[in-house]
């Protein structure tokens, strides 16, 4: 491991220290390594041809104009990417779904875009993890 020196604005350093404390990092280096790994993983997973895993989470109103049916149709259209899906009833109107996906990251991103862009889907988030050798 190599030691490097970086220069940060006071505000950015304070934000880093607050993040480090909230997440329980022992030092700034651990926090910066995790932030950098996350940025590099996200960058590498945005390309077709990169295999990996992803977690897609989103909230939707289950009774909104065929939305549940459209989401299921999209899931079946991309069935080869789906490893597992967790469905949670948040309240009378809203559902949370969490899908674990595996495959070409370009295809995974396309699937996530198809789901998240549906009218009535809120809080859509895709977390990608490149396949490690």
UniProtKB/Swiss-Prot annotation:
Keywords: DNA-binding, Metal-binding, Nickel, Repressor, Transcription, Transcription regulation
Family: Belongs to the transcriptional regulatory CopG/NikR family.
SUPFAM superfamilies linked: ACT-like (SSF55021), Ribbon-helix-helix (SSF47598)
Residues where Ni(2+) binds: 76, 87, 89, 95
Cofactor annotation: Ni(2+)
Gene3D superfamilies documented for this protein: ACT-like. Chain A, domain 2 (3.30.70.1150), Met repressor-like (1.10.1220.10)
Any matching Pfam family: NikR_C
GO annotation, biological process: response to nickel cation
Cofactor note: Binds 1 nickel ion per subunit.
Protein name, entry field: Nickel-responsive regulator
Job of this protein: Transcriptional repressor of the nikABCDE operon. Is active in the presence of excessive concentrations of intracellular nickel.
């Amino acid at each position: 491991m190599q030691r490097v020196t970086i220069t940060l604005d006071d505000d950015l350093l304070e934000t880093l220290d607050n993040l480090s404390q909230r997440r329980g990092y022992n030092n700034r280096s651990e926090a910066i390594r995790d932030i950098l790994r996350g940025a590099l993983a996200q960058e590498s997973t945005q390309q077709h041809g990169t295999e990996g895993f992803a977690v897609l989470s989103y909230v939707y109103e289950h009774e909104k104009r065929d939305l549940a049916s459209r989401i299921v149709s999209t899931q079946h259209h991309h069935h080869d990417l789906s490893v597992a899906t967790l469905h949670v009833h948040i309240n009378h109107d809203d559902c949370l779904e969490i899908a674990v996906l595996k495959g070409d990251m370009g295809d995974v991103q396309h699937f996530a875009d198809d789901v998240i862009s549906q009218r009535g889907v809120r809080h859509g988030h895709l977390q990608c993890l490149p396949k490690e050798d």
